[in-house]
Amino acid sequence: MTKSHLLKYLLTSPNLPVGGFCYSEGMESYLHNKNLNDSNSVKELIISELKIGQIRLDAKLLLDFFDIFNEINDGKNAKSNLQKLLSLNKWILSSKDSIEMREQQTQMAKSLFDLTKEFGFEYLYENNKKSSWPLAWSWACFCFEITKIEMVENFFYAWSANQLSAALRIIPIGSTKTQLIQRDLLAIISKVSKEIMDKQIDDIYFGNVGLAMAQQNHNDLYTKLFRN
């Protein structure tokens, strides 16, 4: 088993590398509106986000960031690639519909950059600026030599695991049902990951009006941050 194969488990762990944080991402609003009341509704919500949610755009950015890191590492178009890197990072952060979501992104990114630094891979590209979670995830996968398809699959898996962990605390739905949902999500994660690999960024459709409203209705999302 290769080192990169083992290192990817650091990224998909529900406790690492983001400090044991578990963000609810507006689930309380769905719960308050009675749109989220059992394991089936939780599963349907996560599947919907995987199919048409903004998380798809985040996943696509992973690939763009990864390609940029490769080119910079090869000494190709360093200046223009760095500008593109910063521009895409700023763009994906600004696409988040609430301050809390942007703060979540930057907190998680900082934690992951801290981890990769401990492994000997310090991020040197404007690290004093606010960085997005996709940027940090892509950097970690680039450093750990994880393949692009595994990078995307692991990203979706970790995100869905975080959502299920939050749902387990909010509803609750029970740990056994949570594990069953995660199992059932594997096929859709694999399918969506392959779709993302074959698409250009302009081809990524997402509709997250409901999620945006849920997050904005939940005035202080950061208070719903659970520590494991």
Swiss-Prot record:
Identify the species of origin: Prochlorococcus marinus (strain MIT 9312)
The protein's predominant localisation is: cytoplasm
Instruction: Using the record, list the residue span of the signal peptide; answer none if the entry has no such feature.
Output: none
Report the function annotation for this chain: Required for maturation of urease via the functional incorporation of the urease nickel metallocenter.
What are the UniProt keywords, alphabetically?
A: Chaperone, Cytoplasm, Nickel insertion
Q: Which family does it belong to?
A: Belongs to the UreF family.
List locations, semicolon-separated: Cytoplasm
Tell me the protein's name: Urease accessory protein UreF
